[in-house]
UniProtKB/Swiss-Prot annotation:
Chain location of the short sequence motif PPXY motif per the record: 162-165
Entry-linked SMART domains: ZnF_C2HC (SM00343)
UniProt domain Peptidase A2: residue ranges: 561-631
Positions with a binding annotation for Mg(2+) 1: 809, 883-884
Gene that encodes it: pol
EC numbers on record: 3.4.23.-, 2.7.7.49, 2.7.7.7, 3.1.26.4
Reactions accelerated catalytically: DNA(n) + a 2'-deoxyribonucleoside 5'-triphosphate = DNA(n+1) + diphosphate; Endonucleolytic cleavage to 5'-phosphomonoester
Residues recorded as bearing Phosphoserine in the entry: 192
Stretches with biased composition (Basic and acidic residues): 434-466, 486-499
Co-factor requirement: Mg(2+)
Name of protein: Gag-Pol polyprotein
GO BP annotation list: DNA integration; DNA recombination; establishment of integrated proviral latency; proteolysis; symbiont entry into host cell; symbiont-mediated suppression of host gene expression; viral genome integration into host DNA; virion assembly
């Protein structure tokens, strides 16, 4: 009845907007014409059943998709977007497609397979080894009606499926479910689980509905198995939430076993599961082990390929799962696969891995036993459940338990009869009875107090014993003295009273003698006492009485020794064993005779004048050490005898080191000095002597093999000579070289490699240390990946619970690793020491410092050596940063025990720690520049003082140093990036360093923030983190916190500047970028732990649905991957942050919808639309064309209607198509000012710029993501400005190059044709100078300013009302602005000079008269920057005044000139010219060096002419060297260096060089000799006797008379000649001096008194500087620069250190302004060589 049939193709064309929307959702684009072509003509040829009218059958669509996606030449890549869109319409149909979509039936197995009868219901499902039996539902549904009720419609296209109907299911016995309701009229078998879920949302749940499970293979309602594949989410979760097979095969095997039991996968599903969860190598290993497990008919593993392939096929089998046999095959396959997983998961036997399983500090014994059993299963072939292995498992359980549990288990009675369960129960008891941390801390405190009490009691006992012993010794001493005094008073030699003949000498009784005295003790006779009672045993110096006055205590070899000052002793004497003795000996003559004694080796002695090395006589028999005349001389001692005794003072009259102490305190002098951080009196040094560098010597890592350093491919040896080294530096590093040679770290060698050795002076001292320059070696050695920990996040592994620390710094760490002999030659260097007999090369046998791979190699070696320590002490935290170790424990006792174990381990391994830098068992330590205390890290005061002590930066380098030092502390400064924003631009190269108020404010704010820096908590990886983020003006700020009770403790303050692209976004999107940036930075500290993000914006919704207009696909993907990782990143509620602390405020802020705000901020003009306006005044079409024609790119732009051209213009050659499109669209908008306009463009670029990108560009400052300016910047700005000119505007995009008769197609073709025609239009040869009559250079667009009208009135022009313009000489007058734009454009094309451009303009015809043409053209040519940099310029500098001496010999000019060919090695001529007289001295030389200059100056000039006052030279190396300048300073000579590349500055000597060379050339031609050295005296004679500017020769000026030219052979003639006497000759010289020298000096001085200003440049002017050495296509001038200082002939400019002659600069702006009223003020600076100039108004 007139109705047309609806087909899928026609349906899609009628709803084409929805089709395009669907395509956009698939990220593709489709065209209607190609859509029809592919559907009706292309796809039917694929022979897959595609109808010409299209179809929504998913099977047919899939077949077409396979054809389209076929790889190689048979594929159709151009059809991919269209078939993808077809598929999307069929899979997710819109309402108008649903009636035509075929219902997707469940996947059934082949119908030929017999279906299984339904199994009877069972109360308990039968057991199976792999999966439970499948049962049919207990109650089946009734057979539904085929036709609906007669009262209803035949079919509801919106709710029902179209015919054909699905087959009905089996009838239910009663037709009702449990609820008694009639089953629904759904006749098909059970639908797919997904349909069931969707239906469940729309329909109420049925009480008796059977639960559907999404298993790959399940039994359907019709008795047939249905297939449902794995979902991608399941595979993703299994993959990411389980360890890899190589890491933990047991866990992954259990997972796969559970999947096989519950999901009943098919063969294909098993392959998909293995491919997802296993790597390729793991999968092959599992399949191989599974095939090995196939058994034959005899029940043993078979090797028959047929049986193996039947049971476990590698290719897809043809099993029918609807048959019992097919299911049995599948069951067998799963069993074999599970066996393969179990066999492949067994690792090779490794008992060390089992031994490495130890019980954790808080791990229960049961959990530890499970881990131990799992290790047995994984790393051994033994089954831990086997009773035969119970003994081994039990012993491992005991030995590897926690130390306290293991010790108690070992002491159990009847241990051998205990079972493993008994041991676990005992261990649980011990574990549960452990003391709590509080109890442990109390016990440790109590033990410490008891220990301290015992120590105090022992000290008191020792003190009492020492006092008692002292009183006893003093009593004996006093008794001896009194007895001696009594005997002296009695006189004589009587020793004792006379005895009777029968009197005992012992008891004084009579009747027996002394030998029979009963009172005399019996026993062996003791040694006879010494005669001197005042001399105590002084071996070792313990308890020795100090020598009598005068005495001095000096340090000898690091130990204090008290000497008796003995001026009679020629040599100083030591009495104690000083160590090794030398082979020298000396004969010592004393009062009782002579004896030979040996000398000691050199000992370092600390004197008042410094350290000296001295050799002593070792005389053990001497009562006291003697300070002889040898050391007294070095000490420069002075001895004064006064009433109180002799006084020994130093050279300055100050007392020397004199020490007076009691005898009982003398032992303190001999104690070994300890580092300041090691507790005084501790036993750490004595208990672990091998662990300290002070007691153990140089270390050697005994477990590390010698290192081999691999070279890069094709590397050759490099040999660099040793730099010159001063004597002081050589003597400073000599002891270090000697020490390393003695220790074997340096050895002599001969190597083709050689690098220089640099002596580096230690700051604040006069000591030197050797540093080798290994940069060239580093370039030739292979790079290795650096594995040194990052100090930024190293402390993240330190939990806050560990608050007792020990810090050790390994000394000479790199020297602990040996170098292989084949690699030792790489690090050779030169060293000469005649005293040691060394003259050649030395090299390192250990890993040297300065080698680029040394930190990484040592860090890895120490990590390997300390691995066992970490395993044995799991409750301790050991952090290592190269050679800095930090040990942390929870209690002081654990820290002490751990420190002892660590020191013992380091000593055994061969490493040495520095005792001076050790911090042992403290609650507050310094590590890596941080202060660790109470689980927090602080900035050290030294770090703060370093930043606070820096002065205000004056240069970019100083500012970079400040920012680098302060940037280390940025974690403590909230908003550091925003705070330092004004400072960073000044650090860029080429930027003028201008320190203003903003920079000073930022500088002070950073310092103030450091003073108030808070304490940051150490990251606790067991707790989640919270990140509070804020953003302000393109700067991201945040604080990372963790919960500490009810408070949030800051962990780090983060801040960063957003990139230019993100900084131009709206605030909500900037917050997304800020969160992404700070989340990445926070990940370095959180180490992958959960992170909760809190911000003032609803960021999660923006990330999930980002606006595509602002974000690129790459950036969107990056943000989503980073922020939508729900396992690691979560978003908290919206909070309002405090700008000072970045923490949330208690009150809630104003809420907003970010998506709404972004929707409002997407465009430039709010009413701009892309739909045609119904009441538009104009409908125009724009197009731009750019194409190549005859090798030249031509371009044009046009604005048209459907039938006529509105505007068309040819654009300059090389214009791109995008730029042409922008110009055309902009022109259309300008012409439609104040009107309603519909404008069509086929340019996506122009359309997107107007609608979307223009606003984005404006916000980001017209910069790209790299911070560079975007292309077509001027055109984009013009377009954005022109958007607001029309009253109403609609910019519509239309496809380009359309065919058809629609209005859009006709208009687009018209615009395209017009643009191409105007671009290809032929123009005359002078087209570049002709002006087109088209807009905008038409009379209608002329706008005359007030100034133009005044100039036209003066010119005599008239105003033409008809033409509405001014007319002069019969031509319309072009306004001044138009003239400037035209001439500037012409100059940019040609860059011709003023005169040539003017000549071309006068020769060519122009329809307009250009107002002020010559003046404008001159201004343009003179201000062109490119011309100023390239064009040559004549010097306008007038001749200056030369400074000359006031008498001969005071002012000389010196220069070297090269004379070729050089005979006998003489190639240079050193020329001296006296500026006063012009006298010349020239000396042939072989080298052009400073040594030659100083030699001739001191040996030739000074003896003959006296010491010069001024020397003038150029900037040659021989004159600017340190040697020449030092000699000049010592002699008091003012050495002036002339301007570079300005030979006129040394004009007098340069002219003399030319004169001498010309004369030598003439003499060589005349004589035929090439020996110019022989002819040089004749050339000098000519130069000295040539008249100068004043008519006098240099000889006459110097000597007052002409030289004698003729000798008269006739004696009579000689008598006639004038022969004045000596007196007369002297009078003549005096007259010459008055008549010649004074007038000459006055003439020179007059020139200086009235100097002519040779150049007009002033301080503050801007000038260009000549580039003397230009490269290819490089400008001739550089700059511009600002003038800082001036002299009459030279300038000093900002950015160039050397003075520049005025002839080498030109003004950047030739208009020299008149002098202003400003004045300059000179201020003194801290640097005596610098001044500060400031300008102020007068």
């Amino acid at each position: 009845m007139g109705q047309t049939a609806t087909t899928p193709l026609s349906l899609t064309l009628d709803h084409w907007k929805d089709v395009e929307r669907t395509a956009h959702n698939q990220s593709v684009e489709v065209r209607k014409r190609r859509w029809v072509t592919f559907c009706s003509a292309e796809w039917p040829t694929f022979n897959v059943g595609w109808p010409r009218d299209g179809t929504f059958n998913p099977d047919i669509i899939t077949q077409v998709k396979i054809k389209v996606f076929s790889p190689g030449p048979h594929g159709h890549p151009d059809q991919v977007p269209y078939i993808v869109t077809w598929e999307a319409l069929a899979v997710d149909p819109p309402p108008w497609v649903k009636p035509f979509v075929h219902p997707k039936p469940p996947l059934l197995l082949p119908p030929s397979a017999p279906s299984l009868p339904p199994e009877p219901p069972l109360s308990t499902p039968p057991q199976s080894s792999l999966y439970p039996a499948l049962t049919s539902p207990l109650n089946t549904k009734p057979r539904p009606q085929v036709l609906p009720d007669s009262g209803g419609p035949l079919i509801d296209l919106l709710t029902e499926d179209p015919p054909p109907y699905r087959d009905p299911g089996p009838p239910s016995p009663d037709g009702k479910g449990d609820s008694g309701e009639v089953a629904p009229t759904e006749g098909a078998p059970d639908s797919s689980p997904m349909v069931s879920r969707l239906r469940g949302r729309r329909e109420p749940p049925v009480a008796d509905s059977t639960t559907s499970q999404a298993f790959p293979l399940r039994l359907g309602g019709n008795g047939q198995f249905q297939y449902w594949p794995f979902s991608s989410s399941d595979l993703y979760n299994w993959k990411n939430n389980n360890p890899s097979f190589s890491e933990d095969p047991g866990k992954l095997t259990a997972l796969i076993e559970s999947v096989l039991l519950t999901h009943q996968p098919t063969w294909d599903d098993c392959q998909q599961l293995l491919g997802t969860l296993l790597t390729g190598e793991e999968k092959q290993r599992v399949l191989l082990e599974a095939r090995k497990a196939v058994r034959g008919e005899d029940g043993r593993p078979t090797q028959l390929p047929n049986d193996i392939n039947d049971a476990f096929p590698l290719e897809r089998p043809d099993w029918d799962y609807n048959t019992q046999r097919g299911r049995n095959h599948l069951v067998h396959y799963r069993q074999l696969l599970l066996a393969g997983l179990q066999n492949a998961g067994r690792s090779p036997t490794n008992l060390a891995k089992v031994k490495g399983i130890t019980q954790g500090p808080n791990e229960s014994p049961s959990a530890f036993l499970e881990r131990l059993k799992e290790a047995y299963r994984r790393y051994t072939p033994y089954d831990p459940e086997d009773p035969g292995q119970e003994t081994n498992v039990s012993m491992s359980f005991i030995w590897q338990s926690a130390p306290d549990i293991g010790r108690k288990l070992e002491r159990l009675e009847d241990l051998k009869n205990k079972t493993l369960g008994d041991l676990v129960r005992e261990a649980e008891k011990i574990f549960n009875k452990r003391e709590t941390p509080e109890e442990r801390e109390e016990r440790v405190r109590r033990e410490t107090e008891e220990k301290e009490e015992r120590r105090r009691a022992e000290d008191e006992r020792r003190e009492k014993e020492r006092d008692r012993r002292r009183h006893r010794e003093m009593s004996k001493l006093l008794a001896t003295v009194v007895s001696g005094q009594r005997q002296d008073r009695q006189g004589g030699e009587r020793r004792r009273p006379q005895l009777d003949h029968d009197q005992c000498a012992y008891c004084k009784e009579k009747g027996h003698w002394a030998r029979d005295c009963p009172k005399k003790p019996r026993g062996p006779r003791g040694p006879r006492p010494q005669a001197s009672l005042l001399t105590l045993d002084d071996q070792g110096g313990q308890g020795q009485e100090p020598p009598p006055e005068p005495r001095i205590t000096l340090k000898v070899g690091g130990q204090p020794v008290t000497f008796l000052v003995d001026t009679g002793a020629q040599h100083s004497v030591l009495t104690q064993n000083p160590g090794p003795l030398s082979d020298k000996s000396a004969w010592v003559q004393g009062a009782t005779g002579g004896k030979r004694y040996r000398w000691t080796t050199d000992r370092r002695v600390h004197l008042a004048t410094g350290k000296v090395t001295h050799s002593f006589l070792h005389v053990p028999d001497c009562p006291y050490p003697l300070l002889g005349r040898d050391l007294l001389t070095k000490l420069k001692a002075q001895i004064h005898f006064e009433g109180s005794g002799a006084q020994v003072v130093g050279p300055m009259g100050q007392p020397l080191q004199v020490l007076t102490l009691n005898i009982e305190d003398e032992y303190r002098l001999h104690e070994t000095s300890k580092g300041p951080d090691v507790p005084l009196g501790s036993t750490w040094l004595s208990d672990f002597p091998q662990a300290w560098a002070e007691t153990g010597g140089m270390g050697l890592a005994v477990r590390q093999a010698p290192l081999i350093i691999p070279l890069r491919a094709a590397s050759t040896p490099v040999s660099i000579k040793q730099y010159p080294m001063s004597r002081e530096a050589r003597l400073g590093i000599k002891p270090h070289i000697q020490r390393l040679l003695d220790q074997g770290i340096l050895v002599p060698c001969q190597s083709p490699w050689n690098t220089p050795l640099l002596p580096v002076k230690k700051p604040g001292t006069n000591d030197y240390r050797p540093v080798q320059d290994l940069r060239e070696v580093n370039k030739r050695v292979e790079d290795i990946h650096p594995t040194v920990p990052n100090p930024y996040n190293l402390l993240s592994g330190l939990p806050p619970s560990h608050q007792w620390y020990t810090v050790l710094d390994l000394k000479d760490a790199f020297f602990c690793l040996r170098l292989h002999p084949t690699s030792q030659s790489l690090f050779a260097f030169e060293w000469r020491d005649p005293e040691m007999g060394i003259s050649g090369q030395l090299t390192w046998t250990r890993l040297p410092q300065g080698f680029k791979n040394s930190p990484t190699l040592f860090d890895e070696a120490l990590h390997r050596d300390l691995a066992d320590f970490r395993i044995q002490h799991p409750d301790l935290i050991l952090l290592q940063y190269v050679d800095d170790l930090l040990l942390a424990a929870t209690s002081e006792l654990d820290c002490q025990q751990g420190t002892r174990a660590l020191l013992q381990t380091l000593g055994d391994l061969g490493y040495r720690a520095s005792a001076k830098k050790a911090q042992i068992c403290q609650k507050q330590v310094k590590y890596l520049g941080y202060l660790l205390k109470e689980g927090q890290r602080w900035l050290t005061e030294a770090r703060k003082e370093t930043v606070m002590g820096q002065p205000t930066p004056k240069t970019p380098r100083q500012l970079r140093e400040f920012l680098g030092t302060a940037g280390f502390c940025r974690l403590w400064i909230p908003g550091f990036a925003e705070m330092a924003a004004p400072l960073y631009p000044l650090t860029k190269t080429g930027t003028l360093f201008k320190w203003g108020p903003d920079q000073q404010k930022a500088y002070q704010e950073i310092k103030q923030a450091l003073l108030t820096a808070p304490a940051l908590g150490l990251p606790d990886l067991t707790k989640p983190f919270e990140l509070f983020v804020d953003e302000k003006q393109g700067y991201a700020k945040g604080v990372l916190t963790q919960k500490l009770g009810p408070w949030r403790r800051p962990v780090a303050y983060l801040s960063k500047k957003l990139d230019p692209v993100a900084a131009g976004w709206p605030p909500c999107l900037r917050m997304v970028a800020a969160i992404a940036v700070l989340t990445k930075d926070a990940g370095k500290l959180t180490m992958g732990q959960p992170l909760v993000i809190l911000a003032p914006h609803a960021v999660e919704a923006l990330v999930k649905q980002p606006p595509d207009r602002w974000l690129s696909n790459a950036r969107m993907t990056h943000y989503q991957a980073l922020l939508l990782d729900t396992d690691r990143v979560q978003f908290g509620p919206i909070v309002t942050l405090n700008p000072a602390t970045l923490l949330p405020l208690p009150e809630e802020g104003l809420q907003h919808d970010c998506l709404d705000i972004l929707a409002e901020a997407h465009g430039t003009r709010p009413d701009l639309t892309d739909q045609p306006l119904p009441d538009a005044d104009h409908t125009w079409y724009t197009d731009g064309s750019s194409f190549l024609q005859e090798g030249q790119r031509k371009a044009g732009a046009a604005v048209t209607t459907e039938t006529e051209v509105i505007w068309a213009k040819a654009l300059p050659a090389g214009t791109s198509a995008q730029r042409a499109e922008l110009i055309a669209l902009t022109q259309a908008l300008k012409m439609a000012e104040g009107k309603k306009l519909n404008v069509y463009t086929d340019s996506r670029y122009a359309f997107a710029t107007a609608h979307i990108h223009g606003e984005i560009y404006r916000r980001r400052g017209l910069l790209t993501s790299e911070g560079k300016e975007i292309k077509n910047k001027e055109e984009i700005l013009a377009l954005l400005k022109a958007l607001f000119l029309p009253k109403r505007l609609s910019i519509i995009h239309c496809p380009g190059h359309q065919k058809g008769n629609r209005a859009e197609a006709r208009g687009n073709r018209m615009a395209d044709q017009a643009a191409r025609e105007v671009a290809t239009r032929e123009t005359p040869e002078t087209s570049t100078l002709l002006i087109e009559n088209s807009a905008p250079y038409t009379r209608e667009h002329f706008h005359y300013t007030v100034t133009d009208i005044k100039d036209l009135t003066k010119l005599g022009a008239t105003y033409d009302n008809a033409q509405k313009c001014w007319v002069y000489q019969g031509k319309p007058v072009m306004p001044d602005q138009f003239t400037f734009e035209l001439l500037d454009f012409l100059h940019q094309l040609t860059h011709l000079s003023f005169s040539k451009t003017k000549a071309l303009l006068e020769r060519s015809y122009s329809p307009y008269y250009m107002l002020n043409r010559d003046r404008t053209l001159k201004d343009i040519t003179e201000t062109c920057k490119a011309c100023a940099q390239v064009n040559a310029s004549k010097s306008a500098v007038k001749q200056g005044t030369r400074v000359r001496g006031h008498r001969p010999g005071t002012h000389w000019e010196i220069d070297f000139t090269e004379v070729k060919p050089g005979l006998y090695g003489y190639k240079y001529l050193l020329v001296f010219v006296d500026t006063f007289s012009g006298w010349v001295e020239a000396f042939p030389t072989k080298k052009e060096t400073a040594k030659v200059v100083t030699k001739k100056l001191l040996e030739e000039i000074f003896p003959r002419f006296g010491m010069p006052q001024v020397l003038g030279t150029d900037n040659g190396p021989a004159f600017v060297s340190k040697v020449s300048q030092t000699v000049a300073d010592l002699l008091g000579v003012d050495w002036k260096l002339h301007c570079a590349y300005r030979p006129q500055s040394s004009g007098q000597v340069e002219r003399m060089n030319r004169t001498i060379k010309e004369t030598l050339t003439k003499l060589t031609l005349a004589t035929g000799s090439r020996d110019w050295v022989l002819l040089l005296p004749l050339a000098l004679y000519r130069a000295r006797n040539t008249p100068g500017p004043h008519g006098l020769t240099p000889y006459e000026i110097l000597y007052g008379a002409p030289p004698p030219l003729v000798n008269f052979p006739d004696p009579d003639m000689a008598k006639v000649t004038h022969n004045p006497s000596l007196q007369a000759h002297l009078q003549a010289l005096y007259l010459v001096q008055h008549e010649v020298w004074r007038p000459l000096a006055a003439a020179y001085q007059e020139q200086l008194d009235r100097p002519v200003v040779p150049h007009p440049f002033r301080v503050g002017d801007t000038v260009w500087v000549r580039r003397h050495q230009t490269k290819n296509l490089e400008p001739r001038w550089k700059g511009p620069y600002t003038v800082l200082l001036t002299t009459p002939t030279a300038l000093k400019v900002d950015g160039i250190a050397a003075w520049i002659h005025a002839a080498h600069v030109k003004a950047a702006d030739t208009k020299i302004e008149p002098p202003s009223e400003s004045t300059w003020r000179v201020q003194r600076s801290q640097n005596p060589l610098k001044i500060r100039l400031t300008r102020g108004t007068s």
